[in-house]
């Protein structure tokens, strides 16, 4: 991932490097909760319903406490019957956010933060990118996650 834009002093040009070969897709699936580090799963292709269901069963379900609320946006794979059943079987309550409301979803702030930091690193190779994602996940401050939840709740009260 590379930065798309740059700044320079007035009258001077910005120069930089960027690979021009084709790139590979790396998708992230994740979950956050108060007081704990994020759970993230990587995929070397687009995420479909089967991969998301695997994430829910393997990573999310063991992490859920009875009565937890699992907040999801309106992506079609989130609304699959098998996903909903897996969340309910784990003892949680699925909550779907209104359409076009990423400001209410605290994990969107994690993705924005990770993308910004990954662009700053300007990594070229896929293994480097995957290692960086793991490092960034581990380095995510728990206090920052709490702030993301507070901000999303404040947005919900405004609406």
Language-model region placement:
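RNase H-like polynucleotidyl transferase catalytic core
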Residues: 12-20, 89-106
């Amino acid at each position: 991932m590379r930065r798309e834009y740059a700044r320079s002093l007035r009258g001077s040009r910005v120069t930089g490097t960027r690979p021009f070969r084709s790139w590979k897709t790396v998708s992230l699936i994740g979950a956050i909760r108060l007081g704990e580090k994020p759970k993230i799963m990587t995929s070397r292709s687009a995420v479909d319903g089967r991969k998301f269901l695997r994430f829910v069963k393997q990573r999310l379900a063991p992490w859920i406490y009875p009565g937890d609320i699992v907040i999801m946006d309106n992506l079609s794979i989130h609304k699959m019957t098998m996903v909903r059943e897996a969340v309910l079987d784990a003892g949680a309550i699925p909550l779907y956010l209104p359409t076009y409301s990423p400001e209410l979803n605290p994990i969107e702030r994690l993705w924005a933060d990770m993308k910004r930091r990954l662009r700053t690193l300007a990594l070229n190779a896929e293994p480097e990118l995957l290692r960086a994602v793991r490092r960034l996940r581990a380095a995510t401050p728990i206090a920052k996650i709490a702030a993301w939840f507070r901000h999303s709740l404040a947005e919900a009260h405004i609406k």
